[in-house]
UniProtKB/Swiss-Prot annotation:
It is found in: Cytoplasm. It holds the Pfam family PP-binding. This is Acyl carrier protein. The lineage of its organism: Bacteria, Pseudomonadati, Chlorobiota, Chlorobiia, Chlorobiales. The modification O-(pantetheine 4'-phosphoryl)serine is found at residue 39.
Length: 80
């Protein structure tokens, strides 16, 4: 899976979990500030990313993932 495929899948997960339109999402979008996520939304999003990409994201790392690009980068690095 290449970076573009990971990005597309992350965008799809955000759309399904957070109820936003795909065209509202940018890589620099912050989950809370730009996409309206609360803490529960963010936890559910991290869990879905773990399931979809078969990666484990420890809580201390999850706390550092606050925007879309950080999520993509984390998954890309975890899949290396």
């Amino acid at each position: 899976m290449n970076v573009e495929e990971i990005k597309d899948k992350v965008f799809d997960i955000i759309v399904s979990k957070m109820g936003v339109n795909k065209d509202q999402i940018k890589t620099e979008s912050k989950f809370a500030d730009d996409l309206g996520a609360d803490s529960l939304d963010t936890v559910e999003l991290i869990m879905e990313l773990e399931n979809e990409f078969d990666v484990q994201i420890p809580d201390e790392d999850a706390e550092k993932i606050s925007n879309v690009q950080q999520a993509i980068d984390y998954i890309v690095n975890a899949k290396k």
